[in-house]
Amino acid sequence: MLNEAAGARRIDVLDEVTPTMAEDVLRLVAEAARTDGQQAVSEQGRLQLRGRREGVRHLLLTEEPSGKLVGYAQLEDTDPVEAPAAELVVHPAHRGQGHGRALGVTLLRESGKRLRVWAHGGHSSARHLAQVLGLTLFRELRQMRRPLGPPATLDIPEPVLPEGVTVRTFRPGEDEAAWLAANAAAFAHHPEQGSLTLRDLEDRMGEPWFDPEGFFLAERGGEIVGFHWTKVHAQERLGEVYVVGVRPEAQGGGLGRSLTAIGLRHLAGRGLPTAMLYVDADNFPAVAVYGRQGFTTYETDLMYRTET
């Protein structure tokens, strides 16, 4: 634990937060989202508030002497190659007072001045903070959306599976290890997704939105060769192409396209009017494929980093 007091604020750097602290952080994130229109801390970041996580540190900024939590940042140093990654948020009613910069400076120090920072939604205040901290833009993550309701439903192609491939839904308690292996193979080039652990999977399976009937597995010869995990955002009435993956040896035969169609048909069958997904802007083949499937860019998350 590291304490840093400066003027009317204090920043605590913790390896683990208590359940009460976690509730306070989630409340702060939700209040900021109502103003910003988007969560400043990702799903993974919110899940990492539960108990101690290797390589994860929490920065809690409180105003003194009240002790009110008005800022939060999370630093994850688990990538063996890339610099530590961070997300941060300041309560809307307490912005413009240097809290964001104070969190950013602390993140730089804690990361050894090797840092990547997400700016979800690419808000102007986040871009300004990145500039103040001397960070440069290096990654753009697009959120793309498409309609699902009639007549758009008719545009979802009929799935055509490669020879020998069958599709079924995920069986909790049976498929975890096999899916993790398939996920690691499919995303060997993508450490954020490919490094998911059993704990990460179980965290998501414990969420209210988890539905095995929307988690599709493609098998050939008893082995998982591809998958499409969908997610329903009930409050927003939004269906998500949460993750689509195909093992390298099964790529190139249209399996990913067919799995995407299966998931979209499932989401449309749930009566959801819109589907969304995330894709890196520089993944031109994927952006093109999703564009042909009716997706258009809705908003963009930006990642900044220190010069390397």
Curated annotation (Swiss-Prot):
Where does this protein come from, organism-wise? Streptomyces bingchenggensis (strain BCW-1)
Highest classification ranks of the organism: Bacteria, Bacillati, Actinomycetota, Actinomycetes, Kitasatosporales
Pfam families named in the record: Acetyltransf_1, Acetyltransf_7
Can you tell me which family this protein belongs to? Belongs to the acetyltransferase family. MshD subfamily.
A single GO BP: mycothiol biosynthetic process
- Describe the location of the N-acetyltransferase domain by residue ranges: 12-149, 165-308
Task: Write out the residues that bind acetyl-CoA 1.
Answer: 88-90
User: Residues that bind acetyl-CoA 2, according to the entry?
Assistant: 244-246, 251-257
Protein's name according to its UniProt entry: Mycothiol acetyltransferase
CDD domains named among the record's database cross-references: NAT_SF
Task: Please give the Gene3D superfamilies that the UniProt record associates with this protein.
Answer: 3.40.630.30
| Subunit and interaction comment | Monomer.
InterPro entries assigned to the protein according to its UniProt record, in alphabetical order? Acyl_CoA_acyltransferase, Bact_Acetyltransf, GNAT_dom, Mycothiol_AcTrfase
Residues involved in 1D-myo-inositol 2-(L-cysteinylamino)-2-deoxy-alpha-D-glucopyranoside binding: 43, 192, 231, 240, 278
Q: State the reactions this protein catalyses.
A: 1D-myo-inositol 2-(L-cysteinylamino)-2-deoxy-alpha-D-glucopyranoside + acetyl-CoA = mycothiol + CoA + H(+)
What domain of life? Bacteria
EC number(s) stated in the UniProt entry for this protein = 2.3.1.189
Q: What does this protein do?
A: Catalyzes the transfer of acetyl from acetyl-CoA to desacetylmycothiol (Cys-GlcN-Ins) to form mycothiol.
Keywords (alphabetical) are:
Acyltransferase, Repeat, Transferase
Q: Which PANTHER family match?
A: AMINOALKYLPHOSPHONATE N-ACETYLTRANSFERASE-RELATED-RELATED
Task: Enumerate the GO terms in the molecular function aspect.
Answer: mycothiol synthase activity
